[in-house]
Amino acid sequence: MSTQGLVQLLANAQCHLRTSTNYNGVHTQFNSALNYKNNGTNTIDGSEAWCSSIVDTNQYIVAGCEVPRTFMCVALQGRGDADQWVTSYKIRYSLDNVSWFEYRNGAAVTGVTDRNTVVNHFFDTPIRARSIAIHPLTWNGHISLRCEFYTQPVQSSVTQVGADIYTGDNCALNTGSGKREVVVPVKFQFEFATLPKVALNFDQIDCTDATNQTRIGVQPRNITTKGFDCVFYTWNENKVYSLRADYIATALE
């Protein structure tokens, strides 16, 4: 499996980090990103990992997001400047930051065996959560780690609405018999990034039929990110003087 196409939360600053304890002010979660390096010439940059101050199985590092994310993978790495790393851990997660659940019912996930090798663990099924936590279970030397969480890209709904799509007076649907249609090109106010879905509804109908059966329809055709064709149609003996419609277009971007 590959992390290609996934979003790195820590590397892209898309989450907040909190820890159970920190060894001191320069051994905090700020040093926990994968491949973090200090400058090697002073102690200001601190350790090349998050390091807990207490060494027991109650320690954790948690990543919290402003909106729920779909977590696909977690990556773990040891401390770059000392022989300290986490050899096994469990994952806990929450959708509301109140009720927490354990991945694989709290079973241990294999960690790392040296300072710098990155070990990815892809979840059995995607985890939908707002917050997710690593709880070290066993370790070498000290609880120290660098990590990353990979998620699906966040998609937001973008909507545009439009009105007054009009066939014109005494349109082509007002003569003849059988299936007839009038096509009205529609241009969106701005271009979508992805192909939208378009829904149409009538707001004016002016038609008649000798059998008292109104047969009309409207549908989108040739949808692009820039616009679509609005197709008004009728069939049989219906006489349609004019039709008017509105649209709503929505895309996930």
Swiss-Prot record:
Keyword Membrane applies: no
Cellular component terms (Gene Ontology): cell cortex; cell surface; cytoplasm; cytosol; extracellular matrix; intracellular vesicle; phagocytic vesicle; protein complex involved in cell adhesion
Domain F5/8 type C: 2-152
UniProt cross-references to Gene3D superfamilies, sorted A to Z: 2.60.40.2080, Galactose-binding domain-like (2.60.120.260)
Statement: the UniProt record of this protein carries the keyword Cytoplasm: yes
GO MF term set: carbohydrate binding; lipooligosaccharide binding; N-acetylgalactosamine binding; oligosaccharide binding; polysaccharide binding
Keywords, alphabetical: Acetylation, Cell adhesion, Cytoplasm, Lectin
Annotated compartments: Cytoplasm
Tissue spec. comment: Stalk cells.
Major site of localization recorded for this protein: cytoplasm
Example of a GO biological process term: cell-substrate adhesion
Span of the annotated motif Cell attachment site: 79-81
Pfam family, one: F5_F8_type_C
Source organism superkingdom: Eukaryota
Residues bearing PTM N-acetylserine: S2
Subunit organization: Tetramer of four different chains (A to D).
Function: Galactose- and N-acetylgalactosamine-binding lectin. May play a role in cell-substratum adhesion rather than in cell-cell adhesion. May be necessary for the maintenance of normal elongate morphology during aggregation.
Name this polypeptide is given: Discoidin-1 subunit A
Species: Dictyostelium discoideum (Social amoeba)
Lineage: Eukaryota, Amoebozoa, Evosea, Eumycetozoa, Dictyostelia
